[in-house]
Amino acid sequence: WSDPEDNRKFFRKMGLSDEQIIPVKADATALPFEEEFFDAIISTDSYNYFGRDPKFLDDKLLPYLKHGGYVYIAIPGMKKDCHSNLPPELLLSWTPDQLDYMHDIMYWENIIRHCKGARVISIHEMESNEEVWNDWLKQENEYAISDRKAMEAGGGKYLNFISIVLQRL
């Protein structure tokens, strides 16, 4: 969703230089970088689209991270997977196929445990869940506007944001 130049401006406002952080918008399955290019990789609100393949970390992401480097992931999720009985509140904004990109912590633990090239530092529900959703819903893009229907109907009680932190071996 994000323009790298908008992110660059934000990072500069936060006191980070272009040498410290590089905003990227690219196909995560074919990154245009040398192996071991990054000290850390941060994925915000996107890993759930491409990272559901248990081989993705080892095959597609970790090669670009220096040994000892960190992966920080923040993704929307579910407090408890309810795909077999989707609440009507969630269906106000998302189709069942779209909701298949949101899962609970146990699901992500099962995906991440297949990774051989990194150790898990933590997988947990973010404490800022309500703040993160509120920030998202304030955005004036078509996706955030559409998501408001479910959240206004109480869909937030089923959703969270999940943090995953890994260190490359």
Q: Where are these predicted regions, by residue range?
A:
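Short, glycine-/aromatic-enriched active-site segment of Class I SAM-dependent methyltransferases
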Residues: P76-L99
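A generic alpha-to-beta junction signature in SAM-dependent methyltransferases
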Residues: G15, F50, Y64-L65
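Short alpha-helix
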Residues: L99-K116
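Class I SAM-dependent methyltransferase SAM/SAH-binding core
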Residues: W1-A30
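A short glycine-rich, Lys/Arg-flanked "PGG" loop and its adjoining helix->strand segment in the class I
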Residues: P54-Y70
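A short SAM/SAH-binding and catalytic strip from SAM-dependent methyltransferases
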Residues: D39-P54
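A short acidic, Gly/Pro-enriched loop at the edge of an enzyme's catalytic core
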Residues: T29-I41
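Conserved Class I S-adenosyl-L-methionine
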Residues: S122-L169
